[in-house]
Amino acid sequence: MAFVRSRANASSGIGVAAECKQTFLELQRKKSHRYVIFKIDDKCKEVVVEKTGSSTESFDDFMDSLPESDCRYAIYDFDFVTEENCQKSKIFFVAWSPSVSRIRAKMLYATSKERFRRELDGVHYEIQATDPSELDIELLRERAH
């Protein structure tokens, strides 16, 4: 197994594990996943993949995977049918920062977000949410159309 060093973010010092981009590409190109949840590792060194959801999982499964009291980054592959009856897909980047999460975690995720987001080439929309009401399936539907 080859180890690829992650590059650190100049503003926060947080790197991005190679598995993050690889897993994103699996979602984007192969449709292997419905969603991917990312977290900053316990040593605050890099962003890593925490969980993936299979292509058969629902939006509710995705929402259940987001912690109630801790920050995360997430990617969700939203499938929909247009008015012209064409099957489409849009990829959403979610910056999840619950209001009850620790201040330090909020700051760490906020300062690392742009660097991490740039690693994921092909994201269509970005959503910042602090509670489930700000991340609703109808919001995704509105943005995608």
UniProtKB/Swiss-Prot annotation:
InterPro entries attached to this UniProt entry: ADF-H, ADF-H/Gelsolin-like_dom_sf, ADF/Cofilin
Domain ADF-H: 11-145
GO terms, biological process: actin filament depolymerization
Pfam families the UniProt entry points to: Cofilin_ADF
Keyword Glycosyltransferase among record annotations: no
Keyword Membrane: no
PROSITE patterns hit by this protein: ADF_H
Annotated SMART domains: ADF
Record key words, sorted: Actin-binding
Record GO cellular component, one term: cytoplasm
GO molecular function terms attached to this record: actin filament binding
Annotated function: Actin-depolymerizing protein. Severs actin filaments (F-actin) and binds to actin monomers.
Protein family according to the UniProt entry: Belongs to the actin-binding proteins ADF family.
Designated name of the protein: Actin-depolymerizing factor 11
Top-level taxonomy: Eukaryota, Viridiplantae, Streptophyta, Embryophyta, Tracheophyta
